[in-house]
């Protein structure tokens, strides 16, 4: 299990360029991350998703620990695999390199309910 306090520092340093972390926060380059766990992929109201995310949601994909871990390590590859579209793209070009960083960010995201 990750360390939420460390994850918060990573999220604020790395994720906030494109995502808001606050409840009711605005849409930025990406959708807000508050309450992401259990959210059906591609469904945040008002955000214009790439088609791969919409297809994932239509297939019933939701964000959980395993999904976020794989996604944060390789966003584009994950969307391609889960959407079934080898040409699917993602605006999220950033990725986390270390498993510990991923675990810590996931632990932090769990605190945002």
From Swiss-Prot:
Protein name listed in UniProt: Cytochrome c2
Keyword Ribonucleoprotein: no
GO molecular function: electron transfer activity; heme binding; metal ion binding
InterPro entries registered for this protein in UniProt: Cyt_c-like_dom (IPR009056), Cyt_c-like_dom_sf (IPR036909), Cyt_c_1A/1B (IPR002327)
Organism lineage string: Bacteria, Pseudomonadati, Pseudomonadota, Alphaproteobacteria, Rhodospirillales
Function: Cytochrome c2 is found mainly in purple, non-sulfur, photosynthetic bacteria where it functions as the electron donor to the oxidized bacteriochlorophyll in the photophosphorylation pathway. However, it may also have a role in the respiratory chain and is found in some non-photosynthetic bacteria.
Pfam families for the chain: Cytochrom_C (PF00034)
Record key words, sorted: Electron transport, Heme, Iron, Metal-binding, Photosynthesis, Transport
GO aspect biological process, one term: photosynthesis
Residues at which heme c binds: 15, 18-19, 92
PTM text: Binds 1 heme c group covalently per subunit.
UniProt similarity note: Belongs to the cytochrome c family.
Transmembrane segments: none
UniProt keyword annotation of Transmembrane helix present: no
Organism: Pararhodospirillum photometricum
Coiled coil (residue ranges): none
């Amino acid at each position: 299990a990750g360390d939420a306090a460390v994850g918060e520092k990573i999220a604020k340093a790395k994720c906030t360029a494109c995502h808001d972390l606050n409840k009711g926060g605005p849409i930025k380059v990406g959708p807000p991350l508050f309450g992401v766990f259990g959210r059906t992929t591609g469904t945040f109201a008002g955000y214009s998703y790439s088609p791969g995310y919409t297809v994932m949601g239509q297939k019933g994909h939701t964000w959980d620990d395993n999904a976020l871990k794989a996604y944060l390590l390789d966003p584009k590859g994950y969307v391609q695999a889960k959407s079934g579209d080898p040409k699917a793209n993602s605006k999220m070009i950033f990725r986390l390199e270390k498993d510990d960083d991923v675990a810590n960010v996931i632990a932090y995201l769990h605190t945002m309910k």
